Amino acid sequence: VDSEEINHPDEDLELPRLMGIKFAVLLMFGGWGVGFGAAGIASYFLGMQGTTAVGNTVGLCLMTFVGVRFSARPAREVLSLKSFSPWLIPPMVLMAFSGSFLVSEVGNLTEEILPVPQELKKMFLGILQADGVEQFLQRAALLSLMAPVTEELMFRGVIMFGLIRVYGGYRGILISSICFGVFHLIPWQAVGATLIGGLLGVMVYRTGSIFAGMAMHAIWNLFPLIVISAFHDMAPEGYGFDSEKVTHVPIPLLILSGGLFYFAFKRFWKLSAQPNEKGFEIAEGC
């Protein structure tokens, strides 16, 4: 046996590890570049929601296509195109409902450190607040259909599959969730998006189905749209959605939300299969 192989057993592994990170970063930058370019062109013809939809769809879909082509595996394996049990939907809904309060408080703590500019806050509210059924359906299509499909195919599909090939299951999930948070660019969203990305990654890994991630992503995005659209004018003084003051979630509600989330996640874990999706088995074997 060559002595150099004994002295440097990990030398050959360094290149694929570097390529794994580089590949994820290149896909992210490609998604940004193409997305911003497409949104810039669309802005001449469409409003804010339209340009967001075009940029998101074009950028992420193109990078997903590139990622699948370079993965050297069938698209069904890379993207985990497999159904999941409908019995998982109830715990997913409960996780999304309770988890929204927890992640909202993470955002509040972030805002205490780094205040959100009022113009940016108004932009967020403009996306989430719908006046009338037609606007609600438009925003629901963007937040609970288009975004979950394109973002899950990219991050829990191509990127996570590639990272798992290099780093193994849970490290691949962790790195892909960080990429998901960074992709959102805005600091007030990045921390929460990273946490949500980790949860979505675990769900896809446990079930072996990208559709589980899409469903959870859609449910999670739908809750704030419903709440802000329905109760925007009914919030008590000091708790308005456009208030300049950071209002924290009450501690009893946080404790209740934490308990519900733990119960729902435990139920999901029990009902979901172990990570035995063929694509992930091959990925970890590589």
Label each PLM-derived region with a short phrase.
Residues 1-18:
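Short, Lys/Arg-rich, polar N-terminal cytosolic tail immediately upstream
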Residues 22-29, 53-54, 89-94, 137, ...:
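Hydrophobic alpha-helical transmembrane segments
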Residues 30-72, 91:
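Alpha-helical transmembrane segments in multi-pass membrane proteins
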Residues 33-40, 177, 189-246:
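Functionally important transmembrane alpha-helices
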Residues 48, 77-147, 165, 238-240, ...:
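Juxtamembrane helix-loop-helix connectors linking adjacent transmembrane helices
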Residues 65-76, 203-206, 262-269:
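Structural signal for the C-terminal ends of transmembrane alpha-helices
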Residues 150-175, 202-209:
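Membrane-interface helix/loop boundary segments of multi-pass membrane proteins
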Residues 218-286:
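C-terminal membrane module of polytopic membrane proteins
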